[in-house]
């Protein structure tokens, strides 16, 4: 059996049994190494060698958590939440409440999508924006599984179809380049997003299904410090609001300039400190709260990097892709389906759709040409196979990001309330729409 398939299946089974994700990743990595014939020592060494790859992201999450706590202390998030609650209180009818609910969802989609291209900060905004809005979600009785689906949609769909920001990297720098390198020299940049429109429609279908069918019923959460918006008026320090705005601008500007979430969050935090929002003696407590809020996400990222390192070391990814080409026969529809399913397994094993393309394109492009798939169909196959698994993977930042914000009060479970809903609503439609694209383009 292929070690990647075994490892991914073991990881998913353990995670679904509510075993801690870090434990599930570590154990399944060891299982994969042993299945591949590696010694226990070599497997552990490969796992440990990969841990450093997740350290940067883990520290980024810790700093973002600290920055989020600092923002909440300024009162700017209370101001934002109260403005929404004020609108809600003035409109008690069911129709008005429903309208406001959909307005909030649309706003979240737009903000999340803009984080991929307009202001390319990726998931950095989630731990900052979402925790203060938990009170609004509770007031509107929004199911957080729906919010997770909305956020994941906004994180993935833009890079699949829009060639700007992270989409420019995915579609042009990685997908187009690897298509050229593996035999599709005549494909031009304008064809790539066009070919990905139908798979992108699958993402839209999944989002609409989540909003109007799966999670349309109201859901109530326990009252906590984060889910209760205090409606009693108290004076808001205007200077603190100004400092908060400057801190957010500073964090964003520094991150875009340096390319580092760590330095960006640090710059924003220092603005809050020098601006008087946080006293010097409180900095330790604020940092501790921020790290506590983001610690589990950070450790999952570190363990995921180790897991990916073992998967690459086993050689199982290449073997899995190559075995596909020898087992299909002449069945074109089956070939398209199996290519997508293998892409799903590889992306869930590696944890990054961006890293999956070079692995898949090496075999998929010649295989697609041999089966007579058109260049547009080949683009759709490779692009969709890579994007598959980004949603619904326990170790993907497209699921860890939403959980980091929604679980700020401990009422949102990563596997059953982010991973499983996004897997069902996005991976299944992506397979269906990706397969249709391969057949009709």
From Swiss-Prot:
Keyword vocabulary terms for this entry: Cell membrane, Membrane, Transmembrane, Transmembrane helix
Record-annotated membrane-spanning stretches: 21-41, 51-71, 94-114, 118-138, 150-170, 195-215, 239-259, 260-280, 291-311, 334-354, 363-383, 419-439
Membrane topology note: Multi-pass membrane protein
The organism's place on the tree of life at top rank: Bacteria
Keyword Membrane set for record: yes
Family matches, as InterPro entries: AA_Transporter-Related (IPR052576), Na/H_Antiport_NhaC-like_C (IPR018461), Na_H_antiport_N (IPR032813)
Signal peptide: none
PANTHER family: AMINO ACID TRANSPORTER YUIF-RELATED (PTHR37821:SF1)
Identification of the protein by name: Uncharacterized membrane protein VP2115
Record organism: Vibrio parahaemolyticus serotype O3:K6 (strain RIMD 2210633)
